Amino acid sequence: MDLGSSSDSAPDCWDQVDMEAPGSAPSGDGIAPAAMAAAEAAEAEAQRKHLSLAFSSQLNIHAKPFVPSVSAAEFVPSFLPGSAQPPAPTASSCDETCIGGAGEPEGKRMEWGAPVEPSKDGPLVSWEGSSSVVTMELSEPVVENGEVEMALEESWELKEVSEAKPEASLGDAGPPEESVKEVMEEKEEVRKSKSVSIPSGAPKKEHVNVVFIGHVDAGKSTIGGQIMFLTGMVDRRTLEKYEREAKEKNRETWYLSWALDTNQEERDKGKTVEVGRAYFETEKKHFTILDAPGHKSFVPNMIGGASQADLAVLVISARKGEFETGFEKGGQTREHAMLAKTAGVKYLIVLINKMDDPTVDWSSERYEECKEKLVPFLKKVGFSPKKDIHFMPCSGLTGANIKEQSDFCPWYTGLPFIPYLDSLPNFNRSIDGPIRLPIVDKYKDMGTVVLGKLESGSIFKGQQLVMMPNKHSVEVLGIVSDDAETDFVAPGENLKIRLKGIEEEEILPGFILCEPSNLCHSGRTFDVQIVIIEHKSIICPGYNAVLHIHTCIEEVEITALISLVDKKSGEKSKTRPRFVKQDQVCIARLRTAGTICLETFKDFPQMGRFTLRDEGKTIAIGKVLKLVPEKD
């Protein structure tokens, strides 16, 4: 910019260069340097006062500090293309001061109050121009606070609005206020839709828990993996990856089981340790697979899985030698079937697996042989052969008779496994019952999260509940059923519930979530009826064992033997026995080491049946008859 002949002198202030338009300043020829300097100083002082007045009229030095609001609508700066301008004070002043009105040609310096046309290269942001420019700049958050950088990271929705009008500039009025609100509302709706919830009007499939039980290496995990593949829960590429990895470890036939045995130790040894979980759906039902361990060392884990099940699938190996090993006294076939019945499983499907083995070759004679040996034992355990048990042949490795009828066994005319599950009658569950949620596990994740199966009642988000036996009042912050968030759950569903009001360290497996108006019973002493299943020596008062009741595991002592019960007539002996032995039924009094939650079998069967184990064996099964109040 030409400053006249005195080009060596520096300007007095940053305004001076801008305010001196070409030709407006004295040329310097014929004017005394002192007079020229005085005129420049006076003009600069006038401009400085005018600018100070403009600032003082717009800025409030006593204003409260800016506090960001996380729930406020997203800030859209006025100088971005297509953004909305702040409303003008009055309609008349807007006509005179709005940016983008009829202005002078570019390059001509205007006085304060005159409109300024923006540059064609981009939005003009300067301290000069009309008073409305100052108003616009000061009404937005100050640049030094970093608001401009935040505003540049606008959402995709607002970018689309900006890109739709590329010709918009600082002088444009921008979209009306209503359109900005619509964009904000659309954005909020998109955010809300991220939480998966089931519409109230949509029909909800019945939830069924299926536990796979049986002797070790019978093929439980392989059948579970095959079901997941056939129902589309595991894709072919994943299975091919498992097959390659299994082949590298010389475990070619184990690859299907890896869909459920995710632990590296389980994959290396080929033995399930923890209860694996998986989900699959049919046309009518939603199923949860509970893959229980078959090894005798992990029977307590199997009991925990069976306690959550609605029906059990007993997997039997038809291979010569394997069936006999599993069904003999030391095998787990007998114990698993008995424990499933004790845990409350009413329906049993017996899968005769490995029918494709060369020693079997889909032989109907071998199938009938296994069936004839199993029926008497299952009947003794308590299952009705006609109503509660269903047999079917299959091959977990090839998938034969799992989803579709197999051509290898034309002698079997029944439904394949998955269609048969879908055809089962619905379980009658009442949502009006008292809330009972036995805790299976817990962990920390943005609060305290508990896992369990809702046995009775219904739970909704925001509900106030009580954790027994500690009587902690808690609030339900969130509910997840099968990895989907929901606001309401009915009985039979496997849940993850985020709680408020209790720490993770204050919860143990076996605790019960109840409603405040209907708490479950708790105590240490109770009378029971037990059946001695297997014990070499006699059992006397003072005998200690491990009690498994719903999801609770607690040390227990038999403090007294009250009477013997005749198996056939059900009559009780009039005298107290001094001991009981194998195959006898008795009424006894038990006392646990700590307080536990329980109910009588008559009032709530699922929380009133139990198992006694000792030295890795199931000693007895029984039911709770009466709760004995503690003496003060």
From Swiss-Prot:
Its EC number is 3.6.5.-. Residues 214-221 are annotated as: G1. The keyword Acetylation does not apply. It comes from the Eukaryota. One of its GO terms (cellular component) is cytoplasm. Residues 270-274 are annotated as: G2. Residues 205-429 form the tr-type G domain. Residues 353-356 are annotated as: G4. This is Eukaryotic peptide chain release factor GTP-binding subunit ERF3B. It comes from Mus musculus. The lineage of its organism: Eukaryota, Metazoa, Chordata, Craniata, Vertebrata. The gene is Gspt2.
